[in-house]
A protein has these predicted regions:
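Short beta-strand or tight-loop elements
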Residues: 20-22
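Mg2+/Mn2+-dependent nuclease catalytic core
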Residues: 47-70
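Nucleic-acid nuclease catalytic cores
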Residues: 68-99
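Short polar/acidic secondary-structure junctions
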Residues: 16, 29-33, 72
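Conserved catalytic cores of phosphodiester-cleaving nucleases, focusing on short active-site segments
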Residues: 24-50
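Short His-Asn-centered micro-motif
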Residues: 14-15, 44-45, 81-84
Length: 139
């Protein structure tokens, strides 16, 4: 879906599978010159587990690195947002473009049209929940 107004195109790319409802929300400036925008960029993920089950949130490392590159290139703030549906909680991390996020290797669920459902070794980053801002929401 896209919504156009005078200056911006808002693109919400939905990955409607059991692992993630809203995969990416990307706000893109019309002329693709990001240097003078004051827009923040956010990656939105959903989790079916409880926010209290783990003390961190594991995300693909390339998603973190992409947010870091975008933040450096645009001089804008970038965020990772994780929606914990069952608890009605939102965890929000600001991704620091200068921080060295430590990757870990994890056997993770893999779901794609090109590969059978199953497990795959993936490079991930574990973001501590204590570093996130936590919000409650209502439907």
């Amino acid at each position: 879906k896209s919504r156009y107004d005078e200056n911006y195109s808002y693109e919400i790319l939905a990955n409607l599978d059991k692992y993630s409802i809203y995969d990416v929300m990307q706000i893109k400036h019309f002329n693709e010159d990001y240097t003078d925008t004051s827009t923040s960029y956010i990656e939105i993920k959903t989790r079916d587990i409880s926010i209290y089950e783990y003390d961190d949130c594991v995300i693909d490392s390339y998603k973190i690195h992409n947010l870091q590159k975008l933040s450096k290139a645009t001089n804008n703030r970038c965020f990772l947002c994780v929606i914990y549906k069952g608890d009605k909680k939102i965890a929000l991390w600001e991704i620091n473009p200068r921080k060295q996020y430590q990757p870990i290797t994890k056997l993770a669920n893999w779901h794609t049209a090109n590969l059978a459902d199953g497990k795959k070794q993936k490079e991930m980053v574990a973001l501590p929940l204590k570093e996130a801002k936590i919000y409650s929401y209502q439907n």
